[in-house]
Regions:
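Adenosine-cofactor binding site in Rossmann-like domains, unifying the SAM/SAH pocket
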Residues: 208-236
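Class I S-adenosyl-L-methionine-dependent methyltransferase module
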Residues: 10-217
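Conserved SAM-binding motif I beta-strand of class I
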Residues: 2-6
């Protein structure tokens, strides 16, 4: 039995969307295109045909409403999967902005994914990525709590980290990026693929999350009856 409890409607709506897709999409290829690629008109067509009829009202309302303040005007959230799902989150937007800054300065961060070993990754980091953190504008952004929030760091935690580092947040972020890009092989490091390539390894399908692997698809689908989800606090569950 697997019980997911979360007060955050956004988190649970994505979980429920994945569960419905896992159960009702015709095969692994369709599932991978929906959540691995996460873009293209075909995702919306498959949502309407296979997934939407099986969503609860709360989840359906979430995906078919807008992220804009009124929720009634603006593009629907499900449209994220047409435009590029992984670009829509605050983290995705921050990564996209970082790549834009890189292009403006003539840097292609995706090249680190082609490094064959740790020494090549380290050399690329020192030549291309490390200088990025010496940019005055980038250092200013790194000191801003909004940047931390985009990375999933709550403001209170950001303040603690800032105090612990004695205001050296740019150096802290620089070391985290170095660790991500240098200390782990790129073959199965899907976090690095998203950060430096803004995608998963679609060609080899090695640097992808376990739930997207074809060899796990049948087992996951078979265990769906054991899963239940609740939008509630743990104290009230």
């Amino acid at each position: 039995r697997i019980v997911a409890v979360d007060l955050n409607t956004c988190h649970m709506s994505l979980t429920r969307l994945k569960l419905a897709a896992l159960e009702h999409l015709p095969n692994h290829e369709a599932f991978y295109k929906f959540f691995g690629l996460g873009e293209g008109k075909i995702t919306l067509d498959r949502y309407e045909q296979y997934i939407r009829p099986h969503l609860d009202s709360v989840t359906r309302e979430y995906w078919e409403s807008s992220a804009w303040p009124t929720r009634k005007v603006g593009p629907k959230r499900i449209g994220y999967f047409k435009r590029g799902f992984y670009n829509q989150s605050k983290l995705g937007q921050l990564i996209r902005f970082a790549h834009l800054v890189g292009r403006v300065t003539g840097k292609d961060y995706e090249e680190i994914l082609e490094a064959k070993d740790e020494s090549e990754r380290q050399a690329y980091y020192e030549k291309v990525i490390e200088p990025y953190f010496r940019n005055r504008f980038v250092r200013m952004l790194a000191r801003n709590p909004v940047t931390g929030f985009s990375l999933g760091i709550p403001p209170s935690q950001f303040d603690i980290k800032n105090e612990e580092s004695q205001g050296a947040m740019p150096e802290l972020f620089r070391e985290r990026v170095r660790k991500l890009g240098v200390d782990f092989d790129m073959d199965d490091n899907y976090f690095a693929w998203q950060a430096f390539g803004r995608r998963y390894d679609h060609a080899n399908k090695k640097a992808i999350p376990d739930y997207l692997r074809e060899e796990n698809f049948k087992a996951l689908r078979g265990r769906l009856p054991k899963v239940e989800t609740h939008i509630v606090s743990l104290t009230k569950f």
